[in-house]
């Protein structure tokens, strides 16, 4: 949709005079507070980048994390809210000047805000000042191009293309955003509450912009009567006419009244008033001089902004947008001193809509914008450099610190390296402990930490359950009966294979039955180590180990070490220790594809229980 030149010119003229800028801030405050939303921003066409919407002014009405006020000034609640917006704007300007030249940045007052004083919503408000939009891009661009309001609910869930600040909105808990085209620009309102679209809210938010504004007068005089009389007298002398000030007549009447009343008290009061008037004039001149020096210093600073960052490669067709051309104006007629001071202040004031982002390097630009009937397309280059200042501030490095902090930077770098090394050592130690824990588990193949912890918990619960079962079923048992070892020979695959079978003393099995059972049962190997018995039964990959010996300290540790050395995974363990004898029944399984012969298993167990 084509943007008329009258809309752009209206926005530019609105922000040229200080009184109009103050009126704009009051209207933004009224818009945000009328519907009780968190902030209000005004976007307008930049004069340095035609066809680009940039941040112009704003009002913050959200939560405040840290408030800094001067003890010498008492402010009302409304003044505190307005002061917060000014403090956020000053912080943005401090970041802006600190990125370009720290030495040239003016000293900041003690009550100024620092990045650590801001909450999430305040950070969203400040960072929004660095964004720029082409018509049709983002919420402000869409509202500007269509000349209709745009309402967005659940802003934290929106996509980055529709809402480039979605990530910032999520961190700041911004839920609803409303953009309304007003006065040649776009009014953006946001809140942390989810508010459904309602036409009456749009009307209430824009009511302050359409109401007729009357000039407001301050109850406190901005300058002394004598100062105004002097200025008026000088202006009259320049014009060649004579003018009489009512204030002079009033002062004369006051003097006559006090003189007629008589008394030294009235004369003393008169002298005090005259001295105060003179001191007010001197202080006003001093302040004016300081302001002039400050603006002259700003003019000398080599600070010229790059184009603001745009989120994608969207280009502007100049044929759809009309930019007003500046034509030479005739020389203005001579004006009085007061009017000249106001015009000088307006010329020195920063131009809204041309603020530079604080997240890119400063360079000198020799390009000058020109206007013609056939304007060339306004191409805004995308900024490749990341937003370094924001990362620096979030990381804890203020942009306005002194330049002589080389030693502090080196110490900070050393502390960072030490922290990284200590964190690496801690992780290595933790990994070693997990490996030790994994080696104590009977059977686990996954090596991630979550699996190791889960298997450990399950294994401990299983052991606890078995201990309870053993304690409940424990009964006095006599010493195991002595067993005899008999060598039984049987044919196996054409070769004679000798295995040892355990035969209990009280067995009723007959010898013919032994031959038949040997064909069906897996091989069993039993060896006697003094008063100790070891039985090994192997079936495919399953292994049954039975150990009976006298109880000793660290006996089970040696047995499990021997089992581990044979690459066996323990499936279950049953243990009993009646009358000083230990009975172990262990079910295990070969961990790999290979198998170990029974006599090697028995020999390893015999050595384990035979150690003293």
UniProtKB/Swiss-Prot annotation:
Residue span of region Disordered: 214-235, 470-526
UniProt keyword terms in alphabetical order: Activator, DNA-binding, Nucleus, Transcription, Transcription regulation
- Domain spans labelled bHLH: 414-463
Could you tell me where the Polar residues compositional bias lies? 483-497
Disulphide bond pairs = none
Composition-biased stretches, type Basic and acidic residues, lie in: 510-521
Q: Which PANTHER family match?
A: TRANSCRIPTION FACTOR EGL1, TRANSCRIPTION FACTOR TT8
Per the record, the similarity remark reads: Belongs to the bHLH protein family.
Subunit structure of this entry? Efficient DNA binding requires dimerization with another bHLH protein.
Q: What is this protein called?
A: Anthocyanin regulatory R-S protein
Give the source species: Zea mays
């Amino acid at each position: 949709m084509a943007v008329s030149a009258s809309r752009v010119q209206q926005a530019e003229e609105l922000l040229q005079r200080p009184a109009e800028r103050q009126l704009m801030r009051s209207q933004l405050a009224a818009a945000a507070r009328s519907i009780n939303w968190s902030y209000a921003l005004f976007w307008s066409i930049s004069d340095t980048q035609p066809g680009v919407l940039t941040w112009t002014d704003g009002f913050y009405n959200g939560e405040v994390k840290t408030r800094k006020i001067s003890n010498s000034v008492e402010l009302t609640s409304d003044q505190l809210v307005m002061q917060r917006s000014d403090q956020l704007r000053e912080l943005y300007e401090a970041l802006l000047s600190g990125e370009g030249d720290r030495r040239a940045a003016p000293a900041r007052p003690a009550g100024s805000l620092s990045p650590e004083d801001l909450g999430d919503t305040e950070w969203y408000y400040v960072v929004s000042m660095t964004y720029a939009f082409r018509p049709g891009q983002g919420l402000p661009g869409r509202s500007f191009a269509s000349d209709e309001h745009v309402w967005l609910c659940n802003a934290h869930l929106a996509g980055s293309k529709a809402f480039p600040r979605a990530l910032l909105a999520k961190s700041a808990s911004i839920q609803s955003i409303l953009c309304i085209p007003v006065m040649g620009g776009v009014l953006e309102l946001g809140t942390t509450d989810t508010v459904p679209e309602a036409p009456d809210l749009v009307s209430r938010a824009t009511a302050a912009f359409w109401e007729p504004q009357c000039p407001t007068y301050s109850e406190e005089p901005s300058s002394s009567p004598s100062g105004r009389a002097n200025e008026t007298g000088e202006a009259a002398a320049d014009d060649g006419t004579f003018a009489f000030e009512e204030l002079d007549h009033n002062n004369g009447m006051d003097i006559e009244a006090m003189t007629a009343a008589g008394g030294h008290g009235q004369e003393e009061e008169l002298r005090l008033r005259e001295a105060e008037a003179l001191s007010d004039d001197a202080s006003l001149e001093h302040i004016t001089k300081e302001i002039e020096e400050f603006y002259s210093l700003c003019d000398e600073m080599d600070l010229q902004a790059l184009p603001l960052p745009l989120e994608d490669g969207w280009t502007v067709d100049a044929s759809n947008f009309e930019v007003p051309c500046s034509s030479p104006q005739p020389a203005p007629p001579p004006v009085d001193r007061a009017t000249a001071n106001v015009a000088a202040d307006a010329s020195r004031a920063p131009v809204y809509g041309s603020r530079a982002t604080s997240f890119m390097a400063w360079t000198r630009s020799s390009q000058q914008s020109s206007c013609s009937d056939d304007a060339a397309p306004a191409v805004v280059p995308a900024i490749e450099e990341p937003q370094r200042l924001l990362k620096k501030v979030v990381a804890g490095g203020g942009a306005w610190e002194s330049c002589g902090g080389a030693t502090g930077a080196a110490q900070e770098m050393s502390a960072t390296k030490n922290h990284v090394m200590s964190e690496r050592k801690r992780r290595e130690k933790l990994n070693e402990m997990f490996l030790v824990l994994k080696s104590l588990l009977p059977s686990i193949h996954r090596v991630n930490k979550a699996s190791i912890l889960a298997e450990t918990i399950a294994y401990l619960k299983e052991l606890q359950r078995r201990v309870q079962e053993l304690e409940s079923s424990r009964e006095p048992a006599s010493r195991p009966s002595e067993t005899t070892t008999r060598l039984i020979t049987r044919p196996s695959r054409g070769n004679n294979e000798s295995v040892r079978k355990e035969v209990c003393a009280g067995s009723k099995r007959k010898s013919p039955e032994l031959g038949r059972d040997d064909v069906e049962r897996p091989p069993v190997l039993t060896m006697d180590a003094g008063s100790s018995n070891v039985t090994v039964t192997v079936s495919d990959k399953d292994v049954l180990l039975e150990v009976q010996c006298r109880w000793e300290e660290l006996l089970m540790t040696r047995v499990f070490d021997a089992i581990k050395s044979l690459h066996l995974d323990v499936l279950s363990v049953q243990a009993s220790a009646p009358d000083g004898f230990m009975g172990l029944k262990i079910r295990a399984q070969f961990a790999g594809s290979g198998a170990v012969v029974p006599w090697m298993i028995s020999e390893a167990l015999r050595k384990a229980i035979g150690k003293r």
